[in-house]
Regions:
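Conserved glycine(s) of the Walker
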Residues: 8, 13
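Conserved substrate/cofactor phosphate-moiety recognition/catalytic segment
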Residues: 15-61
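Short, well-ordered alpha-helix to beta-strand connector turns
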Residues: 25, 60-61, 79-80, 128-129
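Structural recognition of the conserved hydrophobic beta-strand(s) that form the central parallel beta-sheet
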Residues: 62-67
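Short loop/helix-cap segments at secondary-structure boundaries that form the rim of catalytic
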Residues: 72-78, 124-127
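A glycine- and Lys/Arg-enriched "phosphate-lid" helix/loop adjacent to the NTP-binding pocket
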Residues: 81-124, 131, 147, 151-155
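Phosphate-binding beta-loop-alpha motif at adenosine-nucleotide cofactor sites
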Residues: 127-142
């Protein structure tokens, strides 16, 4: 069955759109929470056995997985689509300043790191993504596009 990776920088709305997809009845996994990630040499990485097991599980509909880690590229062949979520920097910073439930992006050092990630990491994600989606529009529209991507990828 179809598996879609949703990736992107902090503040683009990955977790928010995942929550909306779950609300619509889709199976979702946010790898930022739980035991999906471990830190190796200071670098957050997916626990490969757990991700392999997740992607091997039978499922009735599409699976939407959210995450941005250095070893995600190893799993690209296992996903039917890799969707890079993006937003203008001012939108990202506004979201980071006003979000609740996640304090990352509140300090000047963290914002500087996110700026570097946008400059250095986002182009790498863009080069390997199958789709790019600007999340500055309505949440419902972003979720609808992701569902369409899953429908087409599963054919």
């Amino acid at each position: 069955m179809t598996a879609i990776l949703i990736t992107g920088m902090s503040g683009v709305g990955k977790s928010t759109v995942l929550t909306e997809l779950a609300r619509r009845g889709h199976e979702t996994v946010d790898t930022d929470y739980g035991d999906w990630i471990h830190v190796v040499g200071g670098e957050p990485l997916w626990r490969e056995e757990l991700i392999d097991n997740l992607l091997d599980r039978p499922r009735a509909g599409p699976l939407f997985v959210q995450g941005t880690v250095a070893n995600q590229v190893r799993f690209y062949p296992r996903f039917d689509a890799v969707v890079l979520l993006t937003a203008p920097r001012d939108v990202i910073f506004h979201r980071l300043r006003t979000r609740t439930g996640n304090d990352f992006g509140k300090t000047a050092d963290q914002l500087a790191r996110i700026s570097r990630d946008i400059e250095e990491t986002e182009p790498l994600l863009r080069a390997s993504a199958t789709h790019e989606l600007d999340t500055s529009g309505p949440l419902e529209s972003v979720a609808a596009v992701l569902v369409k991507i899953a429908e087409h990828a599963g054919r």
